[in-house]
């Protein structure tokens, strides 16, 4: 906020020529670096992108004052198989991360990796790198929370999993997220892990969510006894 009480940055409105939901700041310039580093770092603000490019992270992009959309995710996954979202650790950052999770889950596939990095509340990416160094920031990126771990965090937030009510509330929160996903192996694994965490069987949880888990194929062997023909002995197959 400036001295006059005005915001430092003003978000421009959507127009037919400028759609924030279809635009990522710095993506064109970052394409080569994204391929070289094999991941893209998505920041909350375009000034983070400018600063990070100067500090050794030219593979950073940013949304333009709007929540992450499905179109943003499609654009990112066309460039790389690994996406890392960086958010502030405050409540606003948590809300933005949850919206990104909701945008990502319907577009997940088993060959893609999406992670969520939450910085301390007193830092943004620029200040974190300046305080702890580029190596520490890179380490934090590589150790960022997986999309499945963040899913469990969102679904169980504020719920006591030691109580039936808490487990039921967690199932209620998880259901629309699981239903939004395509029928991939990751969804099956997430559902089974959620069943373990909530003391539920996978069959009970999939019935609640209206999902079908394909069971592993079982191979059976049968023994057939052939009737002996004239002059022949019984044969067993």
Which residue stretches match the model-derived regions?
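A charged alpha-helical hairpin associated with nucleic-acid processing machineries
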Residues: 31-40, 67-83, 87-237
